[in-house]
């Protein structure tokens, strides 16, 4: 039971950090390359 409580308290923190960093990354990409349909660093 204690392991379940530990998991339920750790998982929301990790998902919040993950989605927060993902949102920040997407915001910075859109700031550097506004309205880009093809990103320059993906083209070969």
UniProtKB/Swiss-Prot annotation:
Source organism superkingdom: Eukaryota
Protein localization: Plastid, Chloroplast thylakoid membrane
Function as written in the Swiss-Prot or TrEMBL entry: May help in the organization of the PsaE and PsaF subunits.
Gene: psaJ
GO (cellular component) term, any one: chloroplast thylakoid membrane
Membrane listed as a keyword: yes
Record protein name field: Photosystem I reaction center subunit IX
Family according to the record: Belongs to the PsaJ family.
Organism in which the protein naturally occurs: Liriodendron tulipifera (Tuliptree)
Pfam families associated with the record: PSI_PsaJ (PF01701)
Transmembrane segments: 7-27
SUPFAM superfamilies referenced in this protein's UniProt entry, alphabetically: Subunit IX of photosystem I reaction centre, PsaJ (SSF81544)
Keyword ATP-binding: no
Chief location category: plastid
GO BP annotations, alphabetical order: photosynthesis
Membrane topology annotation: Single-pass membrane protein
Keywords: Chloroplast, Membrane, Photosynthesis, Photosystem I, Plastid, Thylakoid, Transmembrane, Transmembrane helix
